[in-house]
A protein has these predicted regions:
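Conserved short "hinge" loops at termini or chain/domain junctions
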Residues: 1-54, 104-128
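Short loop/turn elements at secondary-structure junctions
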Residues: 61-128
């Protein structure tokens, strides 16, 4: 779990958010979401490598969404949100037609929360 905490903290730094006191809760929530979608019982030790980055993205998305809904991002400079993010050999480019930085932030937040859900189908187990 410590490795996942470090990954979440590093990704939050991309959004210029340094403190996250409830990382464990949001990591557990993200893992539960993945388990519900895939009908699996993964733990932090048993989660496949292909799902680890999805777990981190979902946890970061949940933290940012929580802070936004609670008004903790009132003073956040949304203009600093990037139009594209590159992770490894994958580049995620967000809409060029977005009018405001807040809309761009919403698109990025949505991508963190559910943008990779189609990849979860590979790990889905059918229940009989």
């Amino acid at each position: 779990m410590e490795n996942f905490k470090e990954r979440v903290i590093e990704k939050l730094k991309l959004f210029k958010i340094d403190e996250a006191t409830t990382i464990e809760y949001f990591l557990n929530k993200a893992l539960s979401s993945i388990n519900n979608f895939t009908n699996q019982n993964y733990t932090f030790d048993s989660i496949p490598d292909g799902l680890k980055y999805i777990l981190v993205d979902k946890a970061v998305g949940e933290i940012l969404n929580f802070k936004k809904l609670n008004g903790e991002l009132k003073d956040y400079d949304f203009s600093s949100v990037l139009k594209s993010i590159k992770e490894g050999d994958t580049t995620e480019t967000y809409s060029n037609t977005v009018k405001t930085p807040e809309e761009l932030f919403e698109i990025m937040l949505n991508n963190l929360l559910i943008g990779k859900d189609n990849e979860l189908y590979r790990y889905r187990r059918l229940q009989w």
